[in-house]
Amino acid sequence: MLILMAAACGKNEDDDIIWDIANFKIEIQVVNGQGQNVTSQVASMAPKAVWNGKTYELNANRKQVNVAARTRALMAVFEGLFTDEGRLYFGELSGSDTYQDATLVIQWGDGTSNEIKFNHELVWKDNEPIFNQSFWLDGKRVNKIVITKK
């Protein structure tokens, strides 16, 4: 039995690691001309998100998730376009999926819209997950999505 225990502690012990890949949501800051957060006023504009040919109204897909009913797996809970903690979000999307030039259009209900493009890719380096993400707002590369509404 001592020999078996020693054999189980070899160099390949990382082979049995099971990774839980976190899901993600796209965070959209909505500010006024002075840079103040106005997300709380967004609902009155009745914004919609257009994604993969489908239209999602604000908060129409919000789900009350029963934590006890969830599995141990990190399944993406897609809620469409929603507000939470003073921010506007779209998602959740699976962190293990690849998105290349994915396009999300926010229609603001006042005749204006913004186009968000993004890339999301999970790559493995030295047996560790690395996430590569990039975002564009109306054709301009950005580090975070900040939309000014007056």
Residues covered by each model-derived region:
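Surface-exposed molecular-recognition determinants
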Residues: 27-30, 59
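Short, solvent-exposed beta-strand/turn "edge" segments of beta-rich domains on protein surfaces
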Residues: 15-21, 38, 93-95
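Tryptophan-paired
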Residues: 41, 45-105
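Bacterial Sec-dependent N-terminal signal peptides
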Residues: 2-27
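A general secondary-structure signal for short beta-strands and their flanking turns/coil
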Residues: 21-23, 101, 142
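Glycine-rich, aromatic-bearing surface loops/beta-hairpins
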Residues: 112-150
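Beta-strand-rich extracellular modules
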Residues: 31, 107-111
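Short amphipathic, basic-aromatic surface patches that mediate peripheral association
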Residues: 30-40
